[in-house]
Structure formats: C-alpha cells, structure tokens
Swiss-Prot record:
PANTHER family named in the record: HISTONE H2B
Designated gene of the protein: htbA
Leader sequence segment: none
GO cellular component, one term: nucleosome
Similarity-based family: Belongs to the histone H2B family.
Protein name (record): Histone H2B
Natural source organism: Emericella nidulans (strain FGSC A4 / ATCC 38163 / CBS 112.46 / NRRL 194 / M139)
GO molecular function, one term: structural constituent of chromatin
Amino acid sequence: MPPKAAEKKPSTGGKAPAGKAPAEKKEAGKKTAAAASGEKKKRGKTRKETYSSYIYKVLKQVHPDTGISTRAMSILNSFVNDIFERVATEASKLAAYNKKSTISSREIQTSVRLILPGELAKHAVSEGTKAVTKYSSSAK
C-alpha cells in the first residue's frame, strides 16, 4: 500500500484549547462508570472503501520500480469511482429500456461501448470478456 502522508495538527500556541482546562485530563487505564456498565461505547473508525490497493497492485505489475503519491492515488480512485458510476447508470438505463430488473454482463458490455471512445472500448470489452470467462471457468 502507498505510504500515508503525515498529517499536521494545528498549533494552539502552547495553550489549552478554549473550554478545556488542563485539569480535565483522564488517566489511561481507568474506565468511567458509563463505559464499565456498557451504556456508551466509543465508535470505531469508519472504514473508507477505496480501490487504492488494487491500483497499487496493477502499478507494481506494470512498473515494479515506480511509486505513487497519495494525491495521485486519490485522483485515480476518484477516476475509477466516476467510471464505475457512469457504467452502472448506463447499464441501469439499458435494463429499464428492455424492461428487465437485472443488470447482466450484456448491459455492462453495451454501456462500456457507449461510454468509452473507440479503441479504448474495444480493449475494455475484450478484457471484461476475458475476466468473465476466467471467473466462469473457476466457479465450476
């Protein structure tokens, strides 16, 4: 995975933030009565789903000695999300036009042909067909 950029925290000029007195610090290891009885639980970190790990794996297959910045990874992730959304929307419209409630590989293939230009669409369709064939043969 790509290394994360170091986050800078805003400086408070050596002073405690407004509304918090220095005496309010909690000791580590001691639980409050509410936490011990199970009334309130801390929320865990919300997970952000990205294509970063997959983009990184493809990069290493193509150019093993090349890295990628966090900003570039973010841009590529946005790009993949955008294309995915366009293809899904178009496939949904095609299914609705044909009065079908299920999006099949045929709708995906047609939407890719409509969205992507020329040679790019041909390559995408051939790679998609290859992936579906590989999946179908391994599932049996």
